[in-house]
Amino acid sequence: MKIGLIGLGRMGYNLALNARDHGHEVVVFNRTLEKVKEAEKQGMIGAYSLEELVLKLEGRRVIWLMVPAGNSVDEMISKLVPLLNKHDIIIDGGNS
């Protein structure tokens, strides 16, 4: 399965590694683009914009948000929704 993951902090990066280690293709985006480059070195698929992340996912998209809870999540969802289709899935994995 190919999944999208936004947020490559400690939790997001380790979740991406775990998914990769279990056979999933992981498309990653982070506002700090250097973290995307590092993830690419670990075999993940880098995306340098939200639009690029969405385009790299096929079929029913699954996008996991690993950004801090609160306004960051709300802002990210408001940017993502116009790019997605009706049956795409957003998972909020952020915590406070």
Language-model segments: which ranges?
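Short, surface-exposed acidic/glycine-rich loop or hinge patches that mediate macromolecular interfaces
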Residues: 70, 95-96
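Beta-loop-alpha module in the N-terminal Rossmann-like domain of NAD(P)-dependent dehydrogenases
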Residues: 66-79
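NAD(P)+-binding Rossmann beta1-loop-alpha1 motif at the extreme N-terminus of oxidoreductases
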Residues: 1-65, 83-88, 93-94
